[in-house]
Amino acid sequence: MKKNLHIIILALSIFINLLFIYIFISEVKPNLNLNLSFILTAAVIVVTYLLFKNKFSELMPVNYNNITETKEDTSHRKTNITFKDVAGLDEVIDELKVIIDFMTNTEKYNKMGAKIPKGILFYGPPGTGKTLLATALAGETNSTFISASGSEFVEKYVGVGASRIRALFAKAKKSAPSIIFIDEIDAVGTKRNTDNNSEKDQTLNQLLVEMDGFNSNEGIIVIGATNRIDMLDEALLRPGRFDRTIHIGAPNMKARLEILKVHTRNKPLDESVSLSELARKTHGMTGAHLAAMCNEAAILAVMKNKSKIGKEEFEEALERVIAGLKKKNPSVLEKERNIAAYHEAGHALIGKILNVNTIEKISIVPRGEALGYVLNFPKEDAFLLTKTELKNKITMLLGGRASEEIIFNEISTGAENDLKEATKIAYQMVCNYGMSELGNRVFDLHMLKSTEIVDKEIDKIINSCYILAKKILLENKHKVIAIAEKLLEKESITKEELETLWEEENTLCV
């Protein structure tokens, strides 16, 4: 309808302009030179075209095949990566070994009337190994690995995305046995709604049709990966399409150790390096983070002309990954340096007294956008946190600002990220965990007419934690000063140095 309207408007525009020229020539300038009248007519047509150039391009017929060939960027290859290259995901690998057995010993499953799953969906945070697992499965089954990104199928022209989906599955059937891997599948598989986006809906519909259209004995498996499973259309998740839905989470300590072994097996390590210690210090880090850390440590060793990678390089690499690049010549004012020292001292002291985490290092060496940081890690991997533990985390986060207020009788902008994280935890306590005076219930802010009651509860939690932080710091002000002065002197304090300083201050108090 829209295109027809554009055609009518363009035709009328040209007709009116030509009519105007005709009247001008016949009535106003009847003796006008014929060549000049021709030039005027041509000029009007050219100007009209230039004014409506974009509309003309939209009205031109689209060659879907050419678009598919030029824009589609799928990889189509055999891979040498196997499960030996995957670490820390033993449970997932065991699940995938069933798929391998299915593909290599089809007959015994056919006798039992069992069908191989058509699709597997990996979901979880970025960097946890979803792409690596898909590639390894292709390597283990000697299948052709065909990968694509969900965004490759999202286009302006209606029908292009669907055309690419058809081409992808046609390629897979031609190359069978094959594995189709669609990364960020949420870009193409988002829930359908009332919005008028026919291209997006057609693309998703075509994907659904293709997944229904091939038989499990054709040797094709579709693997999708996403970190937003909540956004996927229900039709995509139903059995018969994605039969297996597997969560790939951040690795625990044992898994991190296995991942570190894989990423250091071809690297010369010094005797000072303890992979177990590194696994303990890297709580919350994904496989991608660990790979980046190991690579960074190797680069640092080369830059220092060392023959082996030592503990020092790994510690520096860990800080780079977590806190950012160290600034060699920071233009930090002395006043800002003092504020940063007392700010970090406040965090560290409350963290130690409330036993929030193990304090590994305190530093006022600027990294990234931060003037200082406290490197701290949990003593063990925990799946559950109590209300007290969450409030202690908030109190530690607010310790930096509380320390500034006590020492300088003033607060700075340095607590921005601390406040964001503290508010996030308090929000989760109120809305997700039922840990407020509102009782054992959850809240969806999108469904509430007013968020005032939730905001009040968040304020109560943060204010009570801030009062506790100030109380602890006032009672241990001498220790805050001692830690800050040591930071101003040395710029960084290790775990061992903090313990020594703590004991000295305790002795002085006695």
UniProtKB/Swiss-Prot annotation:
Keyword set, alphabetical order: ATP-binding, Cell membrane, Hydrolase, Membrane, Metal-binding, Metalloprotease, Nucleotide-binding, Protease, Transmembrane, Transmembrane helix, Zinc
PROSITE patterns: AAA
Annotated source species: Thermoanaerobacter sp. (strain X514)
Domain of life: Bacteria
Active-site residues annotated for this sequence: E344
Protein EC: 3.4.24.-
Cofactor: Zn(2+)
Gene3D superfamilies per UniProt: 1.10.8.60, P-loop containing nucleotide triphosphate hydrolases, Peptidase M41
GO cellular component: a single term: plasma membrane
Protein name: ATP-dependent zinc metalloprotease FtsH 2
Cytoplasmic compartment spans: 1-4, 53-510
Class of enzymatic activity (EC top level): hydrolase
Residues given in the record as Zn(2+) binding sites: H343, H347, D418
Functional note: Acts as a processive, ATP-dependent zinc metallopeptidase for both cytoplasmic and membrane proteins. Plays a role in the quality control of integral membrane proteins.
InterPro entries named among the record's database cross-references: AAA+_ATPase, AAA_lid_3, ATPase_AAA_core, ATPase_AAA_CS, FtsH, P-loop_NTPase, Peptidase_M41, Peptidase_M41-like
